[in-house]
Every structure is written in C-alpha cells, then in structure tokens.
Amino acid sequence: MAKYVGYKRPKDTKKTVKHLLTYLGHYKWAFLLIAILVFISAGAGIMGTFLIKPIVNNFIVPGNMKGLIIAVCGMGVMYACGALSTLGYNRLMVHTSQKVVSEIRMDLFKHTQKLPLKYFDNNTHGEIMSHFTNDVDTVQEAMNNSFAMVIQSFLTLFGTITMMLVLSVRLTIIVVVFLILMFIFIKYNGKRSKKYYHRQQKELGNINGFVQEMMAGQKVEKVFNHEQKNFEKFCEMNESFRKESTNALAYSGMLIPVIVSLSYFNYALSACVGGIFVIKGIMDLGSISAYLVYVRQSAMPLNQFTQQVNFILSALSGAERIFDMMDEAEEPDEGKVTLCNIIKNADNTITETSDKTGFFAWKLPAGELIELKGDVRFNDVVFGYVPEKRVLNKISLFAKPGQKIAFVGSTGAGKTTIVNLINRFYDIQSGTITYDGIDVMNIKKDDLRRSLAMVIQDTHLFTGTIADNIRYGKLDATDEEIREAAKIANADSFITRLPQGYDTMLTADGGNLSQGQRQLLAIARAAIAKPPVLILDEATSSIDTRTERLIENGMDAIMEGRTVFVIAHRLSTVRNSNAIMVLEKGEVIERGSHDELLEQKGRYYQLYTGQFELD
C-alpha cells in the first residue's frame, strides 16, 4: 500500500498571497469595480449612521416633523444605494471568483501532466486528487464569501473609528482599547487554528488516498479476506481526522462568543460614559446617539472577520498546497533534437516534409537529418530510483534496427527499468543511452516518446468508446485505420460481437471487459501508432495460450522493420527473438538466441528446464 507522504507546513504565506494575486491580476478591472462597489456599500452605511446626529438634534428634539421625514427619506436612499452596491459586488464576485478558480485548476492540471513519474511514486493518488477537489474548493469558497467581506469590514472599521473620533476623542479611546484586545485574541486564536486545520487536511488526504486504494483493490481485498483489517485501519484514520477536526473547530468556535462578549461590554461601558458626558454637557444627545450606533458598528466588522477566519485559514492552507505542487520541478527536458516526417528520394537521400509519410528522421539543431532506424544502445548505464540503491549497475546492451530483443529475469532484475529509461521516464545517473547514435538526453522527450509505443501488463483504458481508446494512439485515425489496427491485434472479432461494436462505451478502466480483451485493445492502440520502436512490457502474461498465439501472429506484421523490446513471464513468448538478455541484479549475465542460450546451459537453460522459476 502506498504511504501518504503528508502535506508540508506553510513555508511562506506572503509568497502564497503573492502567487494568488497573480491570478487575481488577470481580472483587475473586475476586482476594481468590486472594490468601488464595496467602498460605496461601506460608505453608505457609515454616512447613513452619521445622519442620526442632525436628525436627533435638528428635527426630533425641536419637533420638526417635516424635516424629520425628509431626513429619514434621505437616509433611506443612502442605505438603498448601499444595499444595491452589496448585491452588485456579490454577483460580480461570484462570477469572477469562478473564473479565477477555473484558471487555477487548469494550470494545476497542466502542470501535473508535466511532472516526472517520481512525483507520482512519492505521492498517493488521493493526496494529488485532494489538491483538485478539497484545496481548490476551499479557495473558491473563501473568494466567494471572504474577499469582498474582508475589504468591506476594513473600510467600515476605518470609517467608523474616523467618525467616532470626530464625535468624541475620549470615548473613542475606550473603544480602541477593546478593539486591540479583540485583535490580539483573533491573532492568537488564528495561529492555533491554522495549525490544527493543517493537520486536519493532512488526515483528510490520508483518508482520500486509503479509500481510493481500497476501491481500486476490491478484488485483492476480498480474496485475502482483509475487509475487517482494512475497516479497522480506516477507523483509526477516521478517528485521527475526527480529533484534528475537533481541535480545529474548537479553537475557531471560540472566536465569535469571545468577540461578541467583548463588544457587548464595550457598548455598555461606552453608553455609561457617554450618558455622563451628556448630563455634564460635554456631548449633545444627537452625538451620543450616533456614537453608540458606531460602537455597535465597530464590532460588526470584527464579527464578520471572525466568521471568515475559518475560510481564510482553509483557503491559505489549500492555496499553499496547490502552489507547492505547482512549484514542483517539471520533468526536465533539455533536448533539442526533434522528430520529423521525411520522404525517401530515389538517390537514397531524405527530405523533410509536413506530410505524414510514416517515415521519420531526427532533425539536429543545425538542420541535419538522421534517418530514424531504431538502433538503441545502453553504454555502462547506472541507475537507481533511489540514488544510493542501484537497480542497473553499469549495464551495456544494444538492439539493432528491426531486431526483437527479449528481457528475462527475476523480480528486481531491472527489466521494466530498462524500458522506463528508453522512454526517459527517469534519467540515468551515469553512462549513456543512444538512439540512432544520438544521446537520448539530447532528444526532446515528446519527440522521443512519439517514436515509441508501449503495451504494459496493467492495461489502462480511458472512459469512452472502444474506438476512442484505440484512436488514443493516433488521434486523427480514420474508422478504417482503427478497424485495421484491431484486426492486427486480433481484437476485431470480439469487438464486432459486442452489441454496439466499436461504439461500445467502456466503464472505468475498461471494467466491463476481460483482462485479455483489455490487453488486446492496448495492443491495437500501439499498432495504430505504427511506431518505429515497440515495447511490450509483460504484454501477454494475462492472456490465455490460444489468444497469445493469435497475438503473436498479428504482431509479426507490426514488428516488421521495427525494433521491439519484449518482457514476458512466459519463455514461449521470447523464443523467436533475435536476442534474449538474461538479467540478474541489474546486470546482463547472458545474451544470445534461444538456441545459443540453451547450449550454454546457464541461467536461461535453468529457467527453460524449470530448475528456476521465471518471474
């Protein structure tokens, strides 16, 4: 079972905010309009409250009913403008935030496709998926609910304190002291909450990864009767998640009650002192009336902010994890040699063409063309998935154009590693791998892989029709080409027997097909690409003997003129290879044809006669 690596602690919140602002900057005019509407909304509330002073002093106390009605109507118009502005920025914020989050999600997916395989080796699928779901959703929710509210809260608080200073400096000192106490508590509580929210997200990633693995491995789980054991494991993980969630919510839940209590006490003290000021003639009745409303308004922005703290914390944590993944180094590609289509001239020269001729050449940076023939060589190659643990130890081998090379050996001998290195899924630590005399490090990875096709034992099919899955090897393939490729792989017969034939929809990973049928489709997908080099990584180990013979006959057609690498569990699949390489502990210990190796009576002979089992 894959081990959850875990989220890293936030390294630089400022960097995360700066990165987020880069995306917001793409919609600066929309956010500018939102800011203007927020300013109008906050300003309307502040100025509407200030009208209480003249209304009380000039109309209520003197008993001026006509003036009171006009003043109240003016206040109503001002509040209506504020309400319309609030409605406007909320609608605009929803539309804009959706665009921002959609752009982040697209960039994240695009970057994910460029990450090296070792990243996926070290991170569970559940953890990676949580970046696209949980983390992106928290950013979106915070933008919808918190962005405009935080700005409005700041403007309202700033404007309120300013107007309070205008009305009474001495009373405002009392309010500011309470606001400072509230701010200190919010900062302390936020720091503690953020730590627990981080742990909560880590535990959620654990659960996601575990559940995904269990769903993918249902058959294995049932065969070995691990249901109860896995349930107990899930209960442990669920309990850890519950504890961290409880701690996070406990701290965040303290905010509102404490802030509300402080605001009530602040209001009572301000009312008491303000009443004394009115009795002594220091303030008039209108001023204290407006002032007490401002006291309540000064607490509202902080209350609103505390309600959004949870969203802000989750959004920052989610954004940090998203941008951490986006900051992961992309798969390196320093290659400048490209692959191009060519025309073979009568005088044995070659010419580049934009037409798809089925003939290829390597185009060097200087413009020189080297015909692609499929000559692959390893020279003293050293490699290990972990640098200090070698998998291949100064291995040297070669495959001449058109040869079929087979690899046999026990688990961990390095068979699959060799084909991984041919594809440059990983880079070697020393030595060289050449392709038609060109170091593969100098070939652009996209072009290198375009010259290869690979069929692996754990066949992966995509949701879609059978035709779509075969066409994956050549996106512009015609229906006739698809059918021809299926015939080569001997898949046409079972496909045509299906009710909808080539238009049959496949469920997740081709679950409605047998293992053998899935492999036949994978072979058809490779056949339609017509690659110069073909890699069969244990491609026929799960297919019955009869189907295997049909595949071997069909594969002869696409192998002609191509270099083919084969890894198989069955020695019968490699007998007709030009060369068989026996691998042991990352080294080639025997090389030769089937008959030559039998004559040597070495490890291959022992495997063939059953003295050792072939893995």
What are these regions (language model features)?
Residues T16, L24, Y89, M93-S97, ...:
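Juxtamembrane loop-to-helix connectors within ABC transporter transmembrane domains
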Residues K18-L21, W29-F50, P54, A71, ...:
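Alpha-helical segments in transporter systems
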Residues C340-D615:
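ABC-type nucleotide-binding domain
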Residues M1-G45, I60-A71, Y89-M93, S97, ...:
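Membrane-integrated ABC transporters
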Residues L117-K118, N134-M143, F147, I151, ...:
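An intracellular "coupling" helix at the cytosolic face of ABC transporter transmembrane type-1 domains
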